[in-house]
Amino acid sequence: MKKILAFLLVVVGISLVAGAVDNEKDSKFKPIAPDMDTIKHNIENPYSNYYYKKLWRKFLSNDTNMSMQEYRHLYLGYMFQEDYDPYRRSEFSEKIQPLYYKKSHTPAECDTIIKYAELSLADDPFDLRQMEFFIYALKEKKKYARASIWQFRLNHLIQAILSTGKGTKEMPWVVTSPIHEYVIINNMGMMAVEHQPLEGEVDYIIVDKPKDKKAPEGYYFDVSMLLKIRHQKFGD
């Protein structure tokens, strides 16, 4: 499955990163570091267009008209929800973990992946890695309509992350989970080889030598807010 997923991730990643680059050239869109205080205020205000319950209903209804700002508030605003824990792993994801390392799967195994990935996402709605596995299994079962819906969601959540910065030291990408750092790297067709926590609550992910010699040796991710909220909730 690793080989299959690697291919899918490269294809999706190229389109996502290319889209982010094209959008950056558009004067209407530039990567902007999020103002978390403003996001918190907006998602808690029932009269705001970004009120979290409104965004969540639109997300679940597969509203294709959701804007980038709405996706930014949906993704980043999840950190202010009661059940948020950046290091929580669903018990359901562990039930199918052994299947992830197989090169191919039987129809019954794909059914198992679909069952537990869906349960895992109900428990942890922004587990992007589970979304990837879920989409893969749906496609293997030729359930293309459902796969397309989840692919759309995944693509826009990844674009929301990419909209928060450039992956540089000066403008790191903001993530709500450390696992999302690796999802972003994989979706760019690269592989993480080393993780370095830096001062200022920033993670630096060194990647394998890219084919493009102009590409950076690694990418930066801002984890300050997730660490702050984790500390407020659990004191560790």
What is the meaning of each model-derived region?
Residues 139-162:
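TPR/TPR-like (Sel1-like) alpha-helical repeat modules
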Residues 88, 126-127:
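Residues that mark the junctions of alpha-helical repeat units in TPR/alpha-solenoid scaffolds
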Residues 1-28:
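Bacterial Sec-dependent N-terminal signal peptides
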Residues 119-122, 156:
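Conserved structural position within tetratricopeptide repeats
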Residues 92-95, 131-134, 138:
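TPR repeat positional signature
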